[in-house]
Swiss-Prot record:
UniProt feature, compositional bias: Basic and acidic residues: 1-17
Residues bearing PTM Phosphoserine: S270
Name of the gene: RBOHG
Protein name per UniProt: Putative respiratory burst oxidase homolog protein G
Region (EF-hand-like 1): 118-128
Transmembrane segments: 304-324, 393-409, 445-465, 490-510, 519-536, 660-680
PROSITE patterns: EF_HAND_1, EF_HAND_2, FAD_FR
Subunit structure: Monomer and homodimer.
Limits of the EF-hand domain: 176-211, 220-255
């Protein structure tokens, strides 16, 4: 819908341009009446005081005055827009520009610009200066916006007053949905006929879906345009009225933002929660610090006592060795340096033993599943404790090395013969004269090599290297160091480190009796346990070579594998297993959440290409078989060349404890939805089993009681947040299955696509309307392609917690999050806040990848 513009050339005005610039009227308007008008204006009196001025001459004066303003501004004519551009496209782009304006920008700022710009135009703002006045960088859109606002206000001409400018400004900065929608249609309706053809509707759909990165809707623009025309043009007139489309959009948006609050009591509860959640600050510093400490201890008491015990044991060992060597003759020569070195060495022995325990996954899984130690021991923090111990080792190595290299050895070289004599039985009868004597000794070589290997392993274990964050910054040959592979292989250098540690401890200075060489005593049990676990993994993987039954390739570089399930492979939803593909690397094992349920007769994993190994395994599978259409499975029977896959597990994870809670909040970010998918399927299975048991007349009470104790979940909320529309294809069939089987409405599903502008934004209003129409007609969501309606933009997590707290007062809610660390802090903080300020207790569990 384009507006046809006619440009009428005013030759008289051109001829009299010099007269205009000189301040005199053109001859066309020179007559006695107009002379009087001119005098009146010069005198500052009102034009209305001249009774001889008729309406025709007044209009002529206005036209002449506008031309004067145009000439004064240095423009012979107003700039014209490129009408070849899409009207809907300009409108959508314009909404983006408007959204960037600061609604809180003081009107006084705009007013100052207005006064400055109109200083020479008698308080009238030119159309060409509108963008500059309101602070809009896009001059082209500023002109378009001016025209739209002028049409809406029934203003004609290219100038406005301050009052009209203020009215325009208020409409621009009204960010309500209704106002934005009105502005959108005002921008489109350039000829003010209020009509849209099917082609224009199709164009709007394509542009809106493109702006929201929804290729699925863009590809079906013809179908959706026909659906809108069928809805709004039942008489087949060939066009629809904008007002009708506007009402439909408003209706869809009203439904999307409506809430379930249907009673005054619930509204009052919501207000009370909002009031209680307002931040308060105690003026008493001591009381405030005490409250913060108390809340921290209550929320993290498991971590607190474990860390406190660890620090206490280290302090005792350090103090014991310090005092022991302070009372020996060597203290007279080496002083506190030897005490520091020996104290640090004792903590090193402890930590080198402890650091293996958190990665003994089979042992931890057994303790988690078979004992009640999980009540006191934070098994979920095993890797965090592993990292904390690593920091303790680094500190101990630094103190021990510096004390020996920078203090003890120089003091021994500088000691007098009399001072050295008592130490001869430990360092040799002949006093060393060179520093190299200590460096090239067995103790020195083993110690330095250990430090060197530890530095390599510790450095490449840092997140910047392990997650590949530095890959782009490193030069070509070093890029491979910033990868999970480099971390995995260099961590196996600790096999050498432990061998050297035993040798270093055996040839230790100042101790000759075997029973005083305690390094092997510290390491014996943890090393044996860890070695046993690695042997178990090797044995299990050799007999658990699974067959790939099906595979599927999905958008977003996700590979799904369905594998045969070994006979004795028993697991719980939320757990994970290690996967090895010899065709990629015979040594590398990578953990993946199990997306199938314990009741399924197969195992499934979803592998997203996030690193070198995951990209490699996708490449291997794509080479041996032609990639299937998106979401279609390839059967292993028809493709026997699938690569060999080995598995090891299952292993415990935080999400497996969901059955302990009556209410669970499951949050998956991107591929982090994988453990949650298994859980919600398991909830459906357990719910159906529970209903069947309750309906059975036979069966022992003990069996029913046992099922009640193992499965407590009565309500589940699942939030899946992803930025790509194609991601929903990963679990499309599962979502449809859950929506169909969940007869009791136990699970509340929420899919959020963050590429779409938030609900309430006009740029996504058309998508919301199409979503509502298509769901009502076909029962499918146009974004996800499932029976579950999708939401736009990121969830308001505070509102999510608030709604759950309102619906389940006094309940213990388990919050399980899997995804990138970006959300961890916010979700944990909200769990603490609502736990402290409401009757609902939220227990937060995370699983980052």
């Amino acid at each position: 819908m384009q507006r046809v513009s006619f440009e009428v050339k005013d030759t008289e005005a051109e001829k009299s341009s010099s007269e205009i610039l000189s301040g005199s009227l053109p001859s066309t308007y020179r007559n006695p009446a107009m002379e009087n008008v001119g005098n009146a204006v010069d005198d500052g009196s009102s034009v209305k005081n001249n009774p001889k001025l008729d309406m025709q001459k007044q209009n002529g004066l206005v036209k002449w005055f506008k031309k004067c303003l145009t000439m004064v501004s240095g423009e012979s004519k107003a700039p014209r827009l490129d009408r070849s551009k899409s009207t809907a496209g300009q409108a959508l782009k314009g909404l983006k520009i408007i959204s960037k304006t600061d609604g809180n920008a003081a009107w006084t700022v705009v007013e100052k610009r207005y006064l400055k710009i109109t200083a020479n135009t008698d308080g009238l703002l030119l159309r060409s200066k509108f963008g500059e006045c309101i602070g809009m960088n896009s001059k082209e859109f500023a002109l378009e916006l001016f025209d739209a606002l002028a049409r809406k206000s029934h203003l004609k001409g290219d100038v406005i007053t301050e009052t009209e400018l203020k009215k325009f400004w208020e409409q621009i900065n009204d960010k309500s949905f209704d106002s934005r929608l009105i502005t959108f249609f005002d921008l489109m309706d350039k000829d003010s006929d209020g009509r849209l053809t099917e082609d224009e509707v199709r164009e709007i759909i394509k542009l809106s879906s493109s702006a929201n990165h929804l290729s699925c809707i863009q590809n079906k623009a013809d179908e959706y345009a026909a659906m809108i025309m069928e809805e709004l043009d039942p008489d087949h007139m060939g066009y629809i009225m904008m007002e009708s489309l506007k009402k439909l959009l408003l209706q869809a948006e009203t439904k999307s933002v409506s809430t379930d609050i249907n009673s005054e009591e619930r509204k009052e509860l919501s207000d009370m929660l909002t009031e209680s959640l307002k931040p308060t600050r105690d003026p008493n510093h001591l009381r405030r610090w005490y409250c913060q400490l108390r809340f921290f201890v209550l929320d993290s008491w498991q971590r607190v006592w474990v860390i406190a015990l660890w620090l206490t044991i280290m302090a005792i060992l350090f103090a014991y060795k310090y005092i022991q060597y302070k009372n020996r003759a060597v203290y007279e020569v080496l002083g506190p340096c030897v005490c520091l070195a020996k104290g640090a060495a004792e903590t090193l022995k402890l930590n080198m033993a402890l650091i293996l325990l958190p990665v003994c996954r089979n042992t931890i899984t057994w303790l988690r599943n078979k004992t009640r130690l999980g009540v006191f021991v934070p098994f979920d923090d095993n890797l965090n404790f592993h990292k904390v111990i690593a920091v303790g080792i680094a500190i101990g190595v630094a103190i021990h090395s510096v004390s020996h290299l920078a203090c003890d050895f120089p003091l021994l070289i500088a000691a007098t013969p009399a001072e050295y004599m008592p130490l001869g039985k430990f360092f040799g009868e002949e006093q060393p004269k060179r520093y190299l004597h200590f460096v090239k000794s067995t103790e020195g070589i083993t110690g330095l090599v250990m430090v060197f290997l530890m530095v390599i392993a510790f450095t490449l274990a840092m997140p910047w290297f392990r997650r590949g964050k530095l890959e782009k910054k490193l030069p070509g040959p070093l890029k491979k160091l910033a990868s999970f592979n480099a971390f995995w292989y260099t961590h196996h250098l600790f096999v050498i480190v432990y061998i050297l540690l035993v040798l270093h401890g055996y040839y230790i200075y100042l101790n000759k009796e075997w029973y005083k060489k305690t390094t092997w005593m510290y390491l014996a049990v943890p090393v044996a346990l860890y070695a046993y676990e690695r042997l178990i993994r090797a044995f299990r993987s050799s007999i658990r070579t699974v067959k790939v039954l099906k595979m599927a390739a999905y958008p977003g570089k996700v590979l799904t594998l369905q594998m045969s399930k070994p006979t004795n492979f028993k697991y719980m939803s939320g757990q994970y297993m290690f996967v090895n593909c010899p065709a990629v690397s015979p040594f590398e094992w990578h953990p993946f959440s199990i997306t199938s349920t314990p009741q399924d007769d197969y195992l499934s994993v979803h592998i997203k290409a996030l690193g070198d190994w995951t990209e490699a395994i996708q490449g291997v599978f794509s080479e041996v078989s032609k990639p299937p259409p998106v979401g279609d499975m390839l059967n292993g029977a028809n493709s026997p060349r699938f690569p060999k896959i080995m598995i090891d597990g299952p292993y415990g994870a935080p999400a497996q404890d969901y059955k302990k809670y009556e209410v669970v909040l499951l949050i998956g970010l991107g591929i982090g939805a994988t453990p949650m998918i298994s859980i919600i399927k398991d909830i459906i299975n357990n719910t159906e089993t529970k209903e069947q048991l309750s309906q059975m007349e036979k069966g022992s009470p003990q069996e029913q009681q046992g099922n009640k104790e193992t499965f407590k979940t009565r309500r589940a909320y699942f939030y899946w947040v992803t930025k790509e529309q194609g991601t929903f294809d990963w679990f499309k069939n599962i979502m449809n299955e859950i929506a169909e089987r969940d007869k009791s409405k136990v699970i509340e599903l929420h899919n959020h696509c963050t590429s779409v502008y938030e609900e309430g934004d006009v740029r996504s209003a058309l998508i919301r309307m199409l979503q509502s129409l298509n769901y009502a007609k076909n029962g499918l969501d146009i974004v996800a392609g499932t029976r579950v309606m999708s939401h736009f933009a990121r969830p308001n997590w505070k509102n999510v917690y608030k709604q759950i707290a309102m619906d389940h007062p006094g309940a213990n809610v388990g919050v399980f999050y899997c995804g990138a660390p970006v959300l961890t802090k916010e979700l944990r903080q909200l769990a603490l806040e609502f736990t402290h300020k409401t009757s609902t207790r939220f227990s937060f569990h995370k699983e980052n990848f």
